[in-house]
Amino acid sequence: MRTLLTCALTALLASVSAANAGAVVWKFEHKALVGSESIAGAVAESSLMAPGLKTVCDFSYGMTISNSNLKAAGKVSEVAISNCHTDSKACTVKSSTAQKLPWSAHGTTVGSTSYVVVEGVKFSILYAGEECALGETLVTFSGTAGGKYDNTAGTFTFDKASFLATGTAIEGLTEWNATFSTEALGPHKGQLLELG
């Protein structure tokens, strides 16, 4: 009987461990977040590489985070895209808009590295210019973005390596380079946000 209970307990612990493999939680001051927190952040000069054209924009966001079932979760409810320009003299940016908000987010690990994965990402850029091949064309980018989280700086970075590590992609982009800041706006204001 004792052996049977030991085997059952071992199997249960193994299944819980497997279910939480790759799971991480949000932390402030090395303690797991209890309840929820509002986070804001931004990046200047985010580089979006599409076939034949590089577009640079500033992004800012607002997100609510929590730990759900011992896993970091979040909802990106606000995204502003501004100050966009291209590397082409012929092409300008007429407008840029985030769509289908909120976007869901969660934390994960690949090896020993923590990542923020944002799902349901969708934004559009309207290009202009008489000699621009994309002039008066609304280009929509959509998909899932995985960014490497830096616990010492409280930032997450989207780049080719982070997309590859997380198996994520944004349709229409060959590369997205951006390092987003994080800042708590509620009871944890002034504290460094960690993911682990």
Question: Where would I find each of the regions flagged by the language model?
Answer:
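Extracytosolic low-complexity repeat regions of secreted or lipid-anchored proteins
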Residues: 142-170
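Secretory targeting and sorting signals
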Residues: 1-21
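N-terminal segment immediately downstream of the Sec signal-peptide cleavage site
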Residues: 21-80, 164-196
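Short non-domain terminal segments
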Residues: 26, 121, 139, 154-156, ...
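Residue-level detector of solvent-exposed, low-hydrophobicity positions
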Residues: 11, 16, 33-35, 110, ...
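Predominantly extracellular/secreted and cell-surface proteins with exposed
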Residues: 53-152
